[in-house]
C-alpha cells in the first residue's frame, strides 16, 4: 500500500445517479497494481445515514504514531467493538462509504478483518475521521504507520549452558514439531542452509518503495528474510535445525512495511490455524514501528489463540515500550547483546531496553545465510537476529513439551537465561532497574523442568506525578499474582496493595504529594490449582506495628504489602536483633494498612528470610537458597527513606535514598524481607512424567 490520499470530489446529482445505476457503478474496478477494489457511491436514505450516526456520541477514539515521519495519513484501521457480529465490519464499512459519498468523498475499502479482530482498513480523507468515529459499533480508529526491519558463530556457543559446551553446538532437539511463521522480506528458499525447510507462502502485502513507483522483483529483496530464516533453522548456523518455516512478505526491498500489512499477515496466520490446526506455532516479528494500539491488540488475540509471538525490541537505543509490537505484553520481546554479553551498539543507536523487554539474546555480527548465492554467508546485526535466536529456542522447548502455554514458555526462557552478565551502565540510569539482566540460553535439558516453581517480576508503567496518581502491574492470564511491591526514585510514595480488577488480581502502587511518580511491581508465578486471597489489617495506630496473618487453614504466606494515606509515616525503629516476621504473618507501620497474600496449592511450602542493617544503606538484599523461589519482597517496615523493594530473580532488593544527598543521617534500620517458596507437588508430578 502506498500513501495516496483520497481526493474530495463534488459530484452533480444527475451524474452521481448515473454512475450508481450504470455498469461502472455496479462493478468493482481494478487499481494500478491489478488488485480488485470497490468504489461505493451509493446514496442511502437520511434515516439510515448521517442522522442515525449523529445520534451516537463520538465515544470512539483516534490514535496515530507518535513519530511523525513514520505516519501514513489517509490510510486508517477502523476497529469495531468486540461484541459486534461477524458481518458487522462490512456493514459499517459500506455505511461509511455511503455517508462519505453524500459529502462528495470516495472511500477505498482495502481489507476487512474477521478472524483476528473485527474491523476494516480504508483509504480516505482525514476530513471523514469525525464521521467515522461517530459510527455505531466503532471502538477506535488508528492511522496506519510504517514498521521497519531491525537488522543493521559465537552466537550458538553463547546460548549453550556453560557446563554443556563442547567443540560444536549440540542442541537437545531440532524443534521439528514446531512451525515458525516469519513476517519479513522475501526469502531465497533455495539457499543450502534452508532448502527444504522453508515454504514461501503466496502472502505479500508491502508498501511502495521510496523513490520508485514500481516494486522490485522479490528475488532481489530477500537479504533480511533469508538471513533470519537461517538463524532460526539453518543446517549449519541455525538454532533449531529441524524447525520448518513459513514466509510471509510484509517488508519491501528497503526493509519497510506498514502496521496494516502486518495486521493482514497476522490474520493470514490465524485463518490458517483455524482451517488446518497443527502443532505449536511460533510467529517471529523481526520488525518495529511506533506504538500501535491495534497491532498490540492483534498480537494479544493471536497469543490467546495459543500462538507464541517473538518480537525484536527495536534498534533505536530507546525504551521498547514506545514501539510495537515490542510493547505488547503478550509478545516475548528480545533485546540484543554482543559476544561479550553487552548491549549491542549500532552507530549512534543500539538495542532498545526497559520493562517491555523480556530478555536479551545474541544480536551482533551473526553469521547466517546470504541471498547473494545459494552457498553464501553474511554477518548481520540487530534485535531481529536476537529475536530469531529466541524463536529457535522456543521451537526446541515446544518440541519437547508441545503443551506448554505462553506463560510457561516465557517463564522457562527467563529461568534458564544467563543472569547478571550485562553491564547495566550502558543503559540510561532511569532504565537500569527496569531492564532485565538476562541473556537467553537453552535449558540444560528440555525435559524435567516441571518441578520448578517459576516466578518473574513485572514492572508497571511509571505513574503521573500528582498525589492521587497510581501505577498498576498485572500478570498474564495463566499466572498467579503472589506479591506486590512499589518503587519511587524520590521515595515519596504511599505504598501498594493487591486489588481485584476484571476478575483478576492486580498490583496497584500509590504516589505521594511532591513525588515524581511511582512503579507497581508484581511477582507473577506459575502455580497450578492455586487458591489465593488477600487479608488486610487496618492501621494499628499505636504499638510496634500493624500485623496481619494467613488465618485460613492450609494457606501459606507468599507476600506482604502496605499502603498508607498520610504523606510521611515518620520514623519507626523496629528491633533488629530478633526475628520480626512469623512464617504466616506480615508486619507494617502502625500508621499503614498491611496486606498478606495467602495461597493454598498442593505441596506448597514457604518460609521468611530477612536481612537487616542498623544504619541506612543504599541497598540491602536477601536471597532464597537453591531449590526455593522468591515469591515476595518487601521492606520492613515503613522507613521514611526507603525508595521501595523489588525482586531480581530470586533476590529481594530494598533501595534507600543516598544519605549523602539528603543531608540527614538516620539510624533507622533497613531490612529486606524475602518470602521463599517451593512446591513438592510439582516435583512429584514431574517425576511421574519422566
UniProtKB/Swiss-Prot annotation:
Activity regulation info: Its proteolytic activity is autoinhibited by the non-covalent binding of the propeptide to the catalytic domain. Inhibited by EGTA.
Gene Ontology molecular functions: apolipoprotein binding; low-density lipoprotein particle binding; serine-type endopeptidase activity; very-low-density lipoprotein particle binding
S-S pairs: 221-253, 321-356, 455-525, 475-524, 484-507, 532-599, 550-598, 560-586, 606-677, 624-676, 633-652
Residue(s) carrying Phosphoserine: 45, 686
Positions annotated with a glycan in the UniProt record: 531
Main location: cytoplasm
Domain Inhibitor I9: 75-147
InterPro entries, per database record: PCSK9_C1 (IPR041254), PCSK9_C2 (IPR041052), PCSK9_C3 (IPR041051), PCSK9_ProteinaseK-like (IPR034193), Peptidase_S8/S53_dom (IPR000209), Peptidase_S8/S53_dom_sf (IPR036852), Peptidase_S8_subtilisin-like (IPR050131), Peptidase_S8_subtilisin-rel (IPR015500)
GO cellular component: cell surface; cytoplasm; early endosome; endoplasmic reticulum; extracellular space; Golgi apparatus; late endosome; lysosome
Active-site residue list: 184 (charge relay system), 224 (charge relay system), 384 (charge relay system)
Keyword Transcription: no
Entry's EC annotation: 3.4.21.-
Domain annotation Peptidase S8: ranges: 153-459
Keyword Transferase: no
Subcellular location, record wording: Cytoplasm; Secreted; Endosome; Lysosome
C-terminal domain: annotated span: 448-690
UniProt modified residues of type Sulfotyrosine: 36
Residues marked Cleavage (site): 150-151, 216-217
Post-translational modification: Cleavage by furin and PCSK5 generates a truncated inactive protein that is unable to induce LDLR degradation. Undergoes autocatalytic cleavage in the endoplasmic reticulum to release the propeptide from the N-terminus and the cleavage of the propeptide is strictly required for its maturation and activation. The cleaved propeptide however remains associated with the catalytic domain through non-covalent interactions, preventing potential substrates from accessing its active site. As a result, it is secreted from cells as a propeptide-containing, enzymatically inactive protein.
Free-text note on domains in this protein's UniProt record: The C-terminal domain (CRD) is essential for the LDLR-binding and degrading activities. The catalytic domain is responsible for mediating its self-association.
Designated name of the protein: Proprotein convertase subtilisin/kexin type 9
Species per Swiss-Prot/TrEMBL record: Lagothrix lagotricha (Brown woolly monkey)
Amino acid at each position: 500500500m502506498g500513501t495516496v490520499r483520497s481526493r474530495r470530489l463534488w459530484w452533480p446529482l444527475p451524474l452521481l445517479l448515473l454512475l450508481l445505476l450504470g455498469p461502472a457503478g455496479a462493478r468493482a474496478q481494478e487499481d494500478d497494481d491489478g488488485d480488485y477494489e470497490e468504489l461505493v457511491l451509493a446514496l442511502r436514505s437520511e434515516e439510515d445515514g448521517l442522522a442515525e450516526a449523529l445520534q451516537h456520541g463520538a465515544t470512539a477514539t483516534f490514535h496515530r504514531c507518535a513519530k511523525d515521519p513514520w505516519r501514513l495519513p489517509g490510510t486508517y484501521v477502523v476497529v469495531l467493538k468486540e461484541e459486534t457480529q461477524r458481518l458487522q465490519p462490512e456493514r459499517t464499512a459500506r455505511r461509511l462509504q455511503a455517508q462519505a459519498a453524500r459529502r462528495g468523498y470516495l472511500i477505498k475499502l482495502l481489507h476487512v478483518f474477521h478472524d483476528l479482530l473485527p474491523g476494516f482498513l480504508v483509504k480516505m480523507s482525514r476530513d471523514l475521521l469525525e464521521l467515522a468515529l461517530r459510527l455505531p459499533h466503532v471502538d477506535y480508529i488508528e492511522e496506519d504507520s510504517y514498521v521497519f526491519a531491525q537488522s543493521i558463530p559465537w552466537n550458538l556457543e553463547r546460548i549453550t549452558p556453560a557446563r554443556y559446551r563442547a567443540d560444536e553446538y549440540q542442541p537437545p532437539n531440532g524443534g521439528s514439531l514446531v512451525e515458525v511463521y516469519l513476517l519479513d522480506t522475501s526469502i531465497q528458499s533455495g539457499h543450502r542452509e534452508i532448502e527444504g525447510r522453508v515454504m514461501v507462502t503466496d502472502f505479500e502485502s508491502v508498501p511502495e518503495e521510496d523513490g520508485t513507483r514500481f516494486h522490485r522483483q522479490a528475488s532481489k529483496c530477500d537479504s533480511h528474510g533469508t538471513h533470519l530464516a537461517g538463524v532460526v533453522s539453518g543446517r549449519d548456523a541455525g538454532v533449531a535445525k529441524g524447525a520448518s518455516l513459513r514466509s510471509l512478505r510484509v517488508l519491501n526491498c528497503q526493509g519497510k512495511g506498514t502496521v496494516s500489512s502486518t495486521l493482514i499477515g497476522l490474520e493470514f496466520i490465524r485463518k490458517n490455524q483455524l482451517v488446518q490446526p497443527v502443532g505449536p506455532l511460533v510467529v517471529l516479528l523481526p520488525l518495529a514501528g511506533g506504538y500501535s494500539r491495534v497491532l498490540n491488540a492483534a498480537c494479544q488475540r493471536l497469543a490467546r489463540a495459543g500462538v507464541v509471538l517473538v518480537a525484536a525490541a527495536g534498534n533505536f537505543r530507546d525504551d521498547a515500550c514506545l514501539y510495537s509490537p515490542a510493547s505488547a505484553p503478550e509478545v516475548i520481546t528480545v533485546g540484543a547483546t554482543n559476544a561479550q554479553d553487552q548491549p549491542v551498539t549500532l552507530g549512534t543507536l543500539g538495542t532498545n531496553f526497559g520493562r517491555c523487554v523480556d530478555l536479551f539474546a545474541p544480536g551482533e555480527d551473526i553469521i547466517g545465510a546470504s541471498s547473494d548465492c545459494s552457498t553464501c554467508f553474511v554477518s548481520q546485526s540487530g534485535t531481529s537476529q536476537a529475536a530469531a535466536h529466541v524463536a529457535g529456542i522456543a521451537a526446541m522447548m515446544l518440541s519437547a513439551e508441545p503443551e506448554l502455554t505462553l506463560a510457561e514458555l516465557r517463564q522457562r526462557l527467563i529461568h534458564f537465561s544467563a543472569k547478571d552478565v550485562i553491564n547495566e551502565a550502558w543503559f540510561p540510569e532511569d532504565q537500569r532497574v527496569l531492564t532485565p539482566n538476562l541473556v537467553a540460553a537453552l535449558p540444560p535439558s528440555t525435559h524435567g523442568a516441571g518441578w520448578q516453581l517459576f516466578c518473574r517480576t513485572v514492572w508497571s508503567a511509571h505513574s503521573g506525578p500528582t498525589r492521587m496518581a497510581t501505577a498498576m502491574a498485572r500478570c498474564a492470564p495463566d499466572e498467579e499474582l503472589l506479591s506486590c511491591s512499589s518503587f519511587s526514585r524520590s521515595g515519596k510514595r504511599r505504598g501498594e496493595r493487591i486489588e481485584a480488577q476484571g476478575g483478576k488480581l492486580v498490583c496497584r502502587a500509590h504516589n505521594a504529594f511532591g513525588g515524581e511518580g511511582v512503579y507497581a511491581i508484581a511477582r507473577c508465578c506459575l502455580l497450578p490449582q492455586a487458591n489465593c486471597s488477600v487479608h488486610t489489617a487496618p492501621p494499628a495506630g499505636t504499638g510496634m506495628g500493624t500485623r496481619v496473618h494467613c488465618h485460613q487453614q492450609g494457606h501459606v504466606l507468599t507476600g506482604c504489602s502496605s499502603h498508607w494515606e498520610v504523606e510521611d509515616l515518620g520514623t519507626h525503629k523496629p528491633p533488629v536483633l530478633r526475628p520480626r516476621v512469623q512464617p504466616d504473618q506480615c508486619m507494617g507501620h502502625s500508621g499503614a494498612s498491611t496486606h498478606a497474600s495467602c495461597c493454598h496449592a498442593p505441596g506448597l511450602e514457604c518460609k521468611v528470610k530477612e536481612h537487616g542493617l542498623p544504619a541506612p544503606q543504599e541497598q540491602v538484599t536477601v536471597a532464597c537458597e537453591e531449590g526455593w523461589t522468591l515469591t515476595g519482597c518487601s521492606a520492613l517496615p515503613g522507613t521514611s527513606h526507603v525508595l521501595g523493594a523489588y525482586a531480581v530473580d530470586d533476590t529481594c532488593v530494598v533501595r534507600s535514598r543516598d544519605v549523602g544527598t539528603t543531608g540527614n543521617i538516620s539510624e533507622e534500620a533497613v531490612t529486606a524481607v524475602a518470602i521463599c517458596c517451593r512446591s513438592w507437588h510439582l516435583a512429584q508430578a514431574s517425576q511421574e512424567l519422566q
